[in-house]
Amino acid sequence: MSSQYSNVENLSPQTIRQVMRELQEMETTPPEGIKVLINESDVTDIQALIDGPAGTPYAAGIFRVKLTLNKDFPLTPPKAYFLTKIFHPNVAANGEICVNTLKKDWKPDLGIKHILLTIKCLLIVPNPESALNEEAGKMLLERYDDYSQRARMMTEIHAQPAKCGVGAVGDAKDDGGPSTKKHAGLDKKLQDKKKEKLLKEKKRMLKRL
């Protein structure tokens, strides 16, 4: 995130300390399926990786999300976005997330961990009644199988570890050596073939709609 959009200088030192303390606690003891990515130079730019929950169309995907703290935080809620493309009723085309916790149900004592857990829960139980993506909301209510297939397809295309530049949330980082690059090349070929196949399936599915 560019420093020109940073609100660090607008936050109180107490708020900055509280946010950093919570992020460091989450880094040491991460919630299940969530990994925070700390930007020590700008605590208003918070990113995390969320594992797609098992039993949902998002399973096996890894989703990068972003929280942006404004100058009135924690009196006002942060903005939340999916940086990974996702087909979900409560996620707009620009990635903005609609959830009551970040709107009418916001309380200043709700922390970053609570927000990230709420976003993960949204992957398990979408709320089509307050949809930002009306197509996804309508499809979920009226043709769930089609919704599930579309969401799963988007997950397979956009939410794989290679797309996020990371391994699974629990994986160790590689050292970027020759062996890693060799495997990356093979993985890319396999992913390209898989993507081509998925796009063909998507076209067939869209023709049936």
From Swiss-Prot:
Enzyme Commission no: 2.3.2.23
A GO molecular function held by the record: ATP binding
UniProt-listed PROSITE patterns: UBC_1 (PS00183), UBC_2 (PS50127)
Catalytic activity: S-ubiquitinyl-[E1 ubiquitin-activating enzyme]-L-cysteine + [E2 ubiquitin-conjugating enzyme]-L-cysteine = [E1 ubiquitin-activating enzyme]-L-cysteine + S-ubiquitinyl-[E2 ubiquitin-conjugating enzyme]-L-cysteine
Pathway the protein contributes to: Protein modification; protein ubiquitination
Region Disordered, annotated ranges: 168-194
Bias type Basic and acidic residues, positions: 184-194
Domain UBC core: 14-160
One of the GO biological process terms: protein ubiquitination
One GO CC term on file: nucleus
Function field: Catalyzes the covalent attachment of ubiquitin to other proteins. Acts as an essential factor of the anaphase promoting complex/cyclosome (APC/C), a cell cycle-regulated ubiquitin ligase that controls progression through mitosis. Acts by specifically elongating polyubiquitin chains initiated by the E2 enzyme vih/UbcH10 on APC/C substrates, enhancing the degradation of APC/C substrates by the proteasome and promoting mitotic exit.
Designated name of the protein: Ubiquitin-conjugating enzyme E2 S
Organism: Drosophila melanogaster
